[in-house]
């Protein structure tokens, strides 16, 4: 997967390209990340990248020309690498990123992520160059770099070969609309707390059912809203009914 990033702070993305799952993906040539800094497209000695908004008000906007030229340079590089990249602007006004959204975006072989700063970006740039706007939540950050890194990490997990186990992405929280079940590792007893005996039984079917029940229970307790839009399987419906009966 090819990802271009337009950011005033490209060095921040070394956290993604040099570390963890995404760093390993870069090393294994499953992921390529390139950055463009709008400051490199300025013409004045101060490398100015902000400008006053029409109509007044607090704060500044990103200057149009350097940002536009940086996005166009990223699009050109994508084409030269054989990609037709989708341009995404990270914005609180965008569609909320979730598991399904990350999986959907992973189907693109190339993305260009625009990380804004200041009070935002000229609306005409968004209309002419941005294909989609995405948000990571209903809160405001100092810039789009952290949301861009969140999006990269979430999306790249779905790229074949990136995760160590083929089922890892399929069994994450939200993969089937539910929160994940509890997990345990050694030691068998920790501070007097025992690993659930079913996990030591070696009975794979019992373990599967236990994990399914635990996922339902955790979702019901912590995120009951997720159950409202979930089409339960017959098995899940029976397990959920049993949980509700036990709580009566």
Curated annotation (Swiss-Prot):
The record's listing under InterPro entries reads:
Alpha/beta_knot_MTases (IPR029028), tRNA_m1G_MeTrfase_C_sf (IPR023148), tRNA_m1G_MeTrfase_TrmD (IPR002649), tRNA_m1G_MTases_N (IPR029026), tRNA_MeTrfase_TRMD/TRM10 (IPR016009)
Annotated catalysed reactions: guanosine(37) in tRNA + S-adenosyl-L-methionine = N(1)-methylguanosine(37) in tRNA + S-adenosyl-L-homocysteine + H(+)
Give the UniProt subcellular location, in the record's own words.
Cytoplasm
Q: Which domain of life is it from?
A: Bacteria
Listed GO biological process terms: tRNA N1-guanine methylation
Question: Which residues are noted in the entry as S-adenosyl-L-methionine-binding?
Answer: 116, 136-141
Tell me its EC number(s), please.
Answer: 2.1.1.228
Gene Ontology cellular component terms for the protein in this record: cytosol
One example of the protein's molecular function in GO is: tRNA (guanine(37)-N1)-methyltransferase activity
Arranged from A to Z, the UniProt key words for this protein are: Cytoplasm, Methyltransferase, S-adenosyl-L-methionine, Transferase, tRNA processing
**Mind telling me which SUPFAM superfamilies this protein's record contains?**
alpha/beta knot (SSF75217)
Q: What class of enzyme is it?
A: transferase
Query: What this chain does, per the record?
Result: Specifically methylates guanosine-37 in various tRNAs.
Return the similarity comment: Belongs to the RNA methyltransferase TrmD family.
HAMAP family referenced in this protein's UniProt entry, alphabetically: TrmD
Share what the entry says about its subunit structure, partners included: Homodimer.
The protein's name: tRNA (guanine-N(1)-)-methyltransferase
Species of origin: Psychromonas ingrahamii (strain DSM 17664 / CCUG 51855 / 37)
* Primary gene name: trmD
């Amino acid at each position: 997967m090819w990802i271009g990033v337009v950011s005033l702070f490209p060095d921040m993305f070394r956290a993604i390209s040099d570390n963890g799952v995404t760093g390993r993906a870069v090393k294994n040539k499953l992921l390529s990340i390139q950055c463009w800094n709008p400051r490199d497209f300025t013409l004045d000695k101060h490398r100015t990248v902000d400008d006053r908004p029409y109509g007044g008000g607090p704060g500044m906007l990103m200057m149009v020309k350097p940002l536009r030229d940086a996005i166009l340079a990223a699009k050109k590089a994508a084409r030269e690498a054989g990609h037709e990249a989708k341009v995404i602007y990270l914005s609180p006004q965008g569609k909320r990123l979730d598991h399904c959204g990350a999986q959907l975006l992973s189907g693109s072989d190339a993305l260009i992520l625009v990380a804004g700063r200041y009070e935002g970006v000229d609306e005409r740039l968004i209309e002419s160059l941005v294909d989609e706007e995405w948000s990571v939540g209903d809160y405001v950050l100092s810039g789009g770099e952290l949301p861009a890194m969140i999006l990269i990490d979430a999306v790249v997990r779905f790229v074949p070969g990136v995760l160590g186990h083929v089922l890892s992405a399929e069994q994450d929280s939200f993969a089937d609309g539910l929160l994940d079940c509890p997990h345990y590792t050694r030691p068998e007893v920790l501070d007097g707390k025992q690993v659930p005996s079913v996990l030591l039984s070696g009975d794979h079917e019992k373990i599967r059912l236990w994990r399914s029940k635990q996922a339902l229970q955790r979702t019901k307790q912590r995120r009951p809203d997720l159950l409202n839009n979930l089409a339960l399987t017959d098995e899940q419906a029976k397990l959920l009914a049993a949980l509700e009966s036990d709580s009566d």
